[in-house]
Curated annotation (Swiss-Prot):
NCBIfam families: PRK13688.1. GO terms for molecular function: acyltransferase activity, transferring groups other than amino-acyl groups. Its EC number is 2.3.1.-. It is an enzyme of class 2 (transferase). This is Uncharacterized N-acetyltransferase BLi01727/BL05157. SUPFAM superfamilies: Acyl-CoA N-acyltransferases (Nat). Residues 7-151 form the N-acetyltransferase domain.
């Protein structure tokens, strides 16, 4: 049985991330993010993943954003930023991406993401909707948002 788990910030995870870089799009690389967290000795990892056996096959980063800097949801509303969701080739279309997004939704907070690859069908299926583009706010990205009011929360654990 596979499950979503918080990834440790260590050299083993760094090696696993290098495997994604071999297959992935440069924009999805999380290597630099992980290295900076290692340098800062940040024990509260924003990285989550799914292992198939001993191999990391899917991952994402998930950051909680303070409501004071919220430009997408109700004023003062904390929300999650879901970044760099990626599933290795050969493991795609097995529900791993869906598991990661459902895990993020389980926190019961609104979610913002900026998909980088042709994945609009996936995000639509997951209940995400586009926001009205604002050049100053969105800076060339095409953000999508999900509101928890549309689905029941499963957990109150913090990201």
């Amino acid at each position: 049985m596979v499950k979503v788990e918080r990834l440790l910030i260590n050299y083993k995870t760094l090696e696993e991330f290098k495997k994604f870089r071999e297959y992935g799009i440069q924009e999805l690389s999380m290597l630099e993010d992980l290295e900076s967290n290692m340098i800062e000795n940040d024990s509260n990892s924003p990285f989550y993943g799914i292992y198939y056996g001993n191999r990391l096959v899917a991952r994402m980063s998930l950051y909680k954003v303070d409501g004071k800097s919220n430009q997408y949801f109700e004023e003062g509303q904390d929300y999650l930023e879901l970044w760099k969701l990626e599933v290795l080739p050969g493991y795609q279309r097995n529900g791993y991406g869906t598991m990661l997004v459902e895990f993020a939704k389980s926190f019961g907070l609104p979610i913002r993401t900026s998909p980088r690859v042709k994945s609009s069908d996936f995000w639509n299926k997951m209940g995400f909707t586009p926001v009205k583009y604002d050049m100053a706010r969105d800076k060339g990205e095409n953000p999508l948002v999900w509101h928890p009011a549309s689905e029941p929360s499963q957990s109150s654990e913090s990201a």
